[in-house]
Structure formats: structure tokens, C-alpha cells
């Protein structure tokens, strides 16, 4: 009936809002294993790219710049959400971050893949809060749900990206899937409450609000050291 249909649509919308940027474990993990996300089903930018095509490309990761590999994904919906995009890069570079089957053993009660990846890195003593390098993972907490307002539990990891550069002023540039689109953002831990300095972005907003607490440095949860 009509009421039942409306309730289903409301539930569907709430699922999108709650689980964007997270993923659920799969009994049959594939490479790349994109996040289970309602928006991924409408993702036309990446749907035709196969894992074989990713693995066969000739990009050299020696300098961890990732070169043109990232450029072609900017402003697309690749991966569906943040951890889905990390999985694409992980597959391309032959499990440089993790083995997908192993990650399935690290999911917490909340069921987010970004948190599962963090849990795995923490178990291997690979979480650090300083001296990032190009190619390292970068984790953020409390970007979803009730944690947005409280922002107290720094291990409530809800978002993940990849470091692409460390600038002279120690601003960290990273690439991630934010709001369903691949973008570059910035974080500077020495200027936590600064968004812009002149026309230069110092800290990007990783939560949709204009408060300084929503800037990247104030939601930072740690770096995951890459191989």
C-alpha cells in the first residue's frame, strides 16, 4: 500500500545518509571490493572499469605520487564512497594497503569498512599521528551520525583517504571520495582551526558545517603507514 511504500523510501534515504563513507563485510570479497552503498548502484563513472583493467595499467608507484592514475578519477564517483575508492587503489597496486579477506575479520559493530581498515592497521602497530608519507592512508573520526556533534571518540573512524603530498608548510594534501565524488582536500595539524589563509586552503571541511570543529585537523584520527 501507499503507506508501506513511503516508509520504505524513508528507510532507504536514512540508509544513504547513515552509511555513506562506510562498508559492510562480504562473505565473498572481490577486488576491488567497493563499499556497500546505495549511491554506488547509480555510479556510471566507474561501473565499466574492471579489476583486470586496473591491474594491467602501467603506472609506477615508486615515488608514491600515483601520477595520472589519480587524475583520471578526480570529480568522478569511483568506488562509491571513501573506502570503496581506497579499495580501487589497493587492487591497482596489488594489495599495497591490505588483503580484502583479512579486512573482513576487523569489522566493528558499526559495520563500516573505514573503521575495519583502521582496526587492521592498529592491530599491526601501523597507526601514527605524525610524519606522513605520500601513499599513506589518512583516517578521520566522527564525520557521520551522532559523533558529528560530540566529536569525542577519536577512534570512531568514519572516513578514509590517501595522502598525495606534504607541502612545505606541513599541510597534508589527500585524495578521497567525499559526498560521492573524488576530490583533493587539505589538513594542517599546526593550524587546526584555520580553513583559509588568503586564497590558500589550510584545512578542508570534512563535515558539512561551518564550525572550526568540522575542519580536517579536528576530525583527524591517524595515518595508516603504507607498504
Residue ranges of predicted features:
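Aromatic- and glycine-rich peptidoglycan recognition patches
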Residues: 23-38, 48-54, 148-227
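Bacterial N-terminal signal peptides that target proteins for export
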Residues: 2-11
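Bacterial N-terminal signal peptides
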Residues: 12-21
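N-terminal capping segments
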Residues: 24-108, 143, 218-227
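...with weaker cross-activation on analogous glycine-rich loops/strands in unrelated enzymes
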Residues: 101-184
Amino acid at each position: 500500500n501507499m503507506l508501506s511504500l513511503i516508509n520504505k523510501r524513508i528507510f532507504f534515504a536514512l540508509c544513504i545518509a547513515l552509511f555513506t563513507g562506510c562498508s559492510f563485510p562480504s562473505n565473498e570479497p572481490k577486488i576491488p571490493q567497493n563499499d556497500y552503498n546505495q549511491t554506488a548502484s547509480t555510479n556510471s563513472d566507474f561501473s565499466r572499469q574492471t579489476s583486470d583493467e586496473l591491474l594491467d595499467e602501467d603506472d609506477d608507484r615508486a615515488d608514491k605520487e600515483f601520477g595520472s592514475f589519480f587524475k583520471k578519477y578526480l570529480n568522478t564517483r569511483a568506488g562509491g564512497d571513501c573506502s570503496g575508492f581506497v579499495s580501487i587503489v589497493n587492487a591497482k597496486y596489488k594489495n599495497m594497503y591490505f588483503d580484502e579477506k583479512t579486512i573482513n575479520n576487523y569489522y566493528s559493530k558499526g559495520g563500516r569498512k573505514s573503521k575495519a581498515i583502521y582496526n587492521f592497521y592498529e592491530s599491526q602497530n601501523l597507526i601514527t599521528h605524525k610524519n606522513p608519507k605520500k601513499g599513506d592512508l589518512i583516517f578521520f573520526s566522527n564525520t557521520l551520525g551522532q559523533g558529528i556533534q560530540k566529536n569525542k571518540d577519536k577512534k570512531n573512524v568514519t572516513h578514509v583517504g590517501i595522502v598525495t603530498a606534504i607541502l612545505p608548510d606541513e599541510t597534508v594534501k589527500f585524495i578521497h571520495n567525499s559526498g560521492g565524488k573524488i576530490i583533493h582536500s587539505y589538513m594542517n595539524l599546526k593550524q587546526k582551526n584555520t580553513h583559509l589563509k588568503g586564497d590558500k586552503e589550510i584545512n578542508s571541511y570534512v563535515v558539512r558545517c561551518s564550525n572550526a570543529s568540522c575542519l580536517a585537523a579536528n576530525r583527524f584520527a591517524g595515518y595508516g603507514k603504507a607498504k
